[in-house]
């Protein structure tokens, strides 16, 4: 099955939140996720976006994400922090995580 890696869009945030919740369940912290789809949209797409997100998509389904945000290093200047890299369990082992990480490295 082929996948594409692309910049996330506002209408992807429902799927992004679902993957965040899947990660929290894996980490045995499902009740710790309090962010909402609306908050992700507000924080990622309006004013000064607080994060950048790439998605992996198979047949119009978001199956992975890389979520990153800017930070500043006193030694190196502008940098990006990779907060989460998540691939849904069903699609692991197909190189999707590596492709998302590679997109992050190439972009920043």
PLM regions and their residue ranges:
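Alpha-helical elements of Rossmann-like donor-binding domains used by nucleotide-donor carbohydrate transfer enzymes
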Residues: 15-22, 39, 99, 103
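A conserved beta-turn-beta hairpin within the catalytic core of GNAT-like acetyltransferases
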Residues: 72-82, 92
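Conserved GNAT-fold acetyl-CoA-binding loop/helix
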Residues: 20-43
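Conserved beta-strand in the GNAT
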Residues: 55, 61-69
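A short helix-loop-beta-strand connector motif used in the catalytic cores of GNAT acetyltransferases and
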Residues: 44-55
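Hydrophobic adenine-recognition pocket in adenosine-nucleotide-binding enzymes
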Residues: 8, 85-87
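Conserved acetyl-CoA-binding loop-helix of GNAT-fold acetyltransferases
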Residues: 87, 93-106
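A short beta-loop-alpha structural element at the N-terminal edge
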Residues: 4-16
